[in-house]
């Protein structure tokens, strides 16, 4: 199995919705999570780049899909954070529709990393994301972020509780703890991404370029 060099990951483009994304080919792994789940920090830690994904001071403001290329035909996709209280209701609904559309229609999307604050896991929208992914036969890795905020015993208890809870989804859902601050769980994240990028079947370009 090829170990990819995530430090070579580079920004490709931002898109407001699925229609503005590049052609639906290769393999994409998306990162999703609530606005304060530490998604940007996880991407920066994974790639060992301090500012690959911008950490926003105003959560919920950047409603764009950001694409990064790890290697030819292998992309990481940073989906906008969801569930931020101060975003207008209409914008929330619009974004949830766009998220659902991306998860259901994007053929090259083959893995989903759902990030949740270990202290507040499995909120309604987190469960919705996992459900969408499982319904679309997309493998899921749940990362319980900010794991350094809990003592070892509490951390294990949360991990076991979430692992138990996701069994109800009846899908390919793995759960691990993660800390950007302590670099904990980074190896497991890289291993999972390597597995997905190496073993999933890339989507080929069709005749009409669709």
From Swiss-Prot:
<dbReference type="InterPro" id="IPR019987">
    <property type="entry name" value="GTP-bd_ribosome_bio_YsxC"/>
</dbReference>
<keyword id="KW-0460">Magnesium</keyword>
<feature type="binding site">
    <location>
        <position position="40"/>
    </location>
    <ligand>
        <name>Mg(2+)</name>
    </ligand>
</feature>
<feature type="binding site">
    <location>
        <begin position="178"/>
        <end position="180"/>
    </location>
    <ligand>
        <name>GTP</name>
    </ligand>
</feature>
<keyword id="KW-0131">Cell cycle</keyword>
<dbReference type="GO" id="GO:0000917">
    <property type="term" value="P:division septum assembly"/>
</dbReference>
<keyword id="KW-0342">GTP-binding</keyword>
<dbReference type="InterPro" id="IPR006073">
    <property type="entry name" value="GTP-bd"/>
</dbReference>
<keyword id="KW-0547">Nucleotide-binding</keyword>
<feature type="binding site">
    <location>
        <begin position="33"/>
        <end position="40"/>
    </location>
    <ligand>
        <name>GTP</name>
    </ligand>
</feature>
<keyword id="KW-0479">Metal-binding</keyword>
<comment type="similarity">
    <text>Belongs to the TRAFAC class TrmE-Era-EngA-EngB-Septin-like GTPase superfamily. EngB GTPase family.</text>
</comment>
<dbReference type="InterPro" id="IPR030393">
    <property type="entry name" value="G_ENGB_dom"/>
</dbReference>
<dbReference type="GO" id="GO:0005525">
    <property type="term" value="F:GTP binding"/>
</dbReference>
<keyword id="KW-0717">Septation</keyword>
<feature type="domain" description="EngB-type G">
    <location>
        <begin position="25"/>
        <end position="199"/>
    </location>
</feature>
<feature type="binding site">
    <location>
        <begin position="145"/>
        <end position="148"/>
    </location>
    <ligand>
        <name>GTP</name>
    </ligand>
</feature>
<dbReference type="InterPro" id="IPR027417">
    <property type="entry name" value="P-loop_NTPase"/>
</dbReference>
<dbReference type="GO" id="GO:0005829">
    <property type="term" value="C:cytosol"/>
</dbReference>
<dbReference type="GO" id="GO:0046872">
    <property type="term" value="F:metal ion binding"/>
</dbReference>
<feature type="binding site">
    <location>
        <begin position="60"/>
        <end position="64"/>
    </location>
    <ligand>
        <name>GTP</name>
    </ligand>
</feature>
<protein>
    <recommendedName>
        <fullName>Probable GTP-binding protein EngB</fullName>
    </recommendedName>
</protein>
<keyword id="KW-0132">Cell division</keyword>
<comment type="function">
    <text>Necessary for normal cell division and for the maintenance of normal septation.</text>
</comment>
<feature type="binding site">
    <location>
        <begin position="78"/>
        <end position="81"/>
    </location>
    <ligand>
        <name>GTP</name>
    </ligand>
</feature>
<dbReference type="Pfam" id="PF01926">
    <property type="entry name" value="MMR_HSR1"/>
</dbReference>
<feature type="binding site">
    <location>
        <position position="62"/>
    </location>
    <ligand>
        <name>Mg(2+)</name>
    </ligand>
</feature>
């Amino acid at each position: 199995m090829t170990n990819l060099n995530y430090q070579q990951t580079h920004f490709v483009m931002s898109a407001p919705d699925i229609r503005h994304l590049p052609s639906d080919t290769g393999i994409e792994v998306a990162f999703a999570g609530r606005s304060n789940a530490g998604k940007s920090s996880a991407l920066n830690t994974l790639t060992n780049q301090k500012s690959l994904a911008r950490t926003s001071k105003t959560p919920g403001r950047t409603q764009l899909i950001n694409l990064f290329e790890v290697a030819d035909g292998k992309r990481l996709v940073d989906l906008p954070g969801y569930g931020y209280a101060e975003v207008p209701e209409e914008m929330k609904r619009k974004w949830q529709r766009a998220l659902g559309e991306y998860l259901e229609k994007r053929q090259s999307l083959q893995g989903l990393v759902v990030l949740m604050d270990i202290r507040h896991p499995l909120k309604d929208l987190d469960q919705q994301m996992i459900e969408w992914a499982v319904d679309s036969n997309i493998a899921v890795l749940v990362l319980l972020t900010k794991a350094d905020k809990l003592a070892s015993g509490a951390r294990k208890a949360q991990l076991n509780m979430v692992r138990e809870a996701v069994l109800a989804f009846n899908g390919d859902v793995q759960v691990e703890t993660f800390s950007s601050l302590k670099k904990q769980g980074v190896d497991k994240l890289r291993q999972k991404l390597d597995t997905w990028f190496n073993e999933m079947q890339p989507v080929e370009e069709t005749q009409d370029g669709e």
